Structures are given as C-alpha cells and as structure tokens.
UniProtKB/Swiss-Prot annotation:
Belongs to the V-ATPase G subunit family. NCBIfam families: V_ATP_synt_G. InterPro entries: V-ATPase_G. It comes from Nicotiana tabacum (Common tobacco). The keyword Transport applies. This is V-type proton ATPase subunit G 1. Catalytic subunit of the peripheral V1 complex of vacuolar ATPase (V-ATPase). V-ATPase is responsible for acidifying a variety of intracellular compartments in eukaryotic cells. GO terms for cellular component: vacuolar proton-transporting V-type ATPase, V1 domain.
C-alpha cells in the first residue's frame, strides 16, 4: 500500500510538473505574442511619424524654395535701384569732381 501511495504521489508530481510546464509555455507564448504586437504597433507609429515628418519637410522645402525665387527677384530689383541711384549721384557730382581735380592739378604750389 505504501508503494502504491508513493507511486500515486510520483504520478501526481509528474502531472503537476507537466501542468506547470504547460502553464509556463502558455505564458511564454502569450508574452511573445504581446511583444510581437507591441513591435508591430511601434513600427506602425514610427512609419506614421516618419511620413508626417517627411511631409512637413517637403512642405517647408516648397515654401523656402518658392520664397527664394521671390527673394532673388526682390534682391535684383533692389540692386538695380541702388545701381541707378549711384549712377545718378555720380552724374550729379561728376562736374564738381572734375573741377576740383583740374584746380588741384593746375594749381602750382611752392
């Protein structure tokens, strides 16, 4: 009877060990499934964020490149206006400068 009860105890322990192994395997499988799902969700969020940032970059690039054409045109106009102003001023003071130079060149000092 003692050996039968010992045999039953061993069988009970083996069954409990198998049950525990089954529980551990189920937990491991569930954990792997959760990790896989979390990884997929993270990759999806990363892809969405990357697409958003790329769209923002392209939008800003279009704005700045569009502005640069306008800026170049504006700068050309400002430069042309300054050149015309300098030409006008040069024409205005040119006779005075010529007179001053002639006076200094023709005046003899001892």
């Amino acid at each position: 009877m003692a050996s039968s009860s010992g045999q039953n105890g061993i069988q009970l322990l083996l069954a409990a060990e198998q049950e525990a192994q089954h529980i551990v395997n189920n937990a491991r499988t569930a954990k792997q499934a959760r990790l896989k799902q979390a990884k997929e969700e993270a990759e999806k969020e990363i892809a969405e964020f990357r697409a958003y940032m790329e769209a923002e970059f392209q939008r800003k690039l279009e704005q700045t490149s569009g502005d640069s054409g306008a800026n170049v045109k504006r700068l050309e106009q400002e430069t042309d206006a300054k050149i015309e102003h300098l030409k006008t001023e040069a024409e205005r003071v040119s006779p005075d400068v010529v007179q001053m130079l002639l006076r200094h060149v023709t005046t003899v000092k001892n």
